[in-house]
Amino acid sequence: NPESMMQLAKWCESEFGPVHLLFNNAGVAPAELLPIWQTKPNDWQWAFGVNVMGVLHGIQAFVPAMMAHGEGGRVINTCSGNGAFINLPSTPIYTSSKASVSSITEVLKLQLEQAESNVKVSILFPGPHTVRTKLFSAERNRPEELARDPNAPEHPISSVEDMLEMMSSMGIEMETTEPEEVASFCLAEIKKSNYWINPVNEKSEQAFKDRVESIITRSDLPNPNIF
């Protein structure tokens, strides 16, 4: 919530001095098995409350002080190619939330430039493959007031291992990326002052190219096959 983020910003400054790097990285993925027209408001409110409003609260709590101290800095918002570049039909809530993060990040960059601030912005796409985190078990942190519908079907995937096993049963061998690799790549790109922190994944890039081509040519939207 905004109050806790404001308190965190004040604590960071009192403990460590001026903040120069802000990583808005919290994210959740609800267990999605239903089409949009059957989803429940609680699922949307929980995902957007963390994935979108969490980014917004971080920006509003930290960026004004980062601009004021005049020493420069950088905001890094964690996004996903699923939402920023393509939209997977199996995850309507998650992909919609990450599309919002992409837009917020671009606008923040442009507005800081218009303000002639030396606070810069980057957008991070963890990868290049599925990252071994606990994102698939995010339901463990879901607040009671936004509880999942007890009648909703159980999702078969609650860990990266579950996903790997399911894809393997379909004849698809997925690769994974360790969080430490993402962190190292991110820091290296920050040193280069890059906006796009996006490791190379040829299948994802081809899916994005196909989508852009359909926009330019006004042709039918392609199926974003990234596996």
Task: Please give the residue ranges for each predicted region.
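SDR active-site lid
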Residues: 111-197
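The beta1-alpha1 cofactor-binding region of Rossmann-like NAD(H)/NADP(H)-dependent oxidoreductases
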Residues: 1-7, 41
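A glycine-rich helix->loop->beta "capping" turn
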Residues: 11-22
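A short, exposed helix-loop element centered on a Lys and neighboring polar residues
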Residues: 59-60
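Active-site loop of short-chain dehydrogenase/reductase
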Residues: 18-19, 66-80, 116-120
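Catalytic loop of short-chain dehydrogenase/reductase
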Residues: 76-100, 105-106, 110-114, 127-130, ...
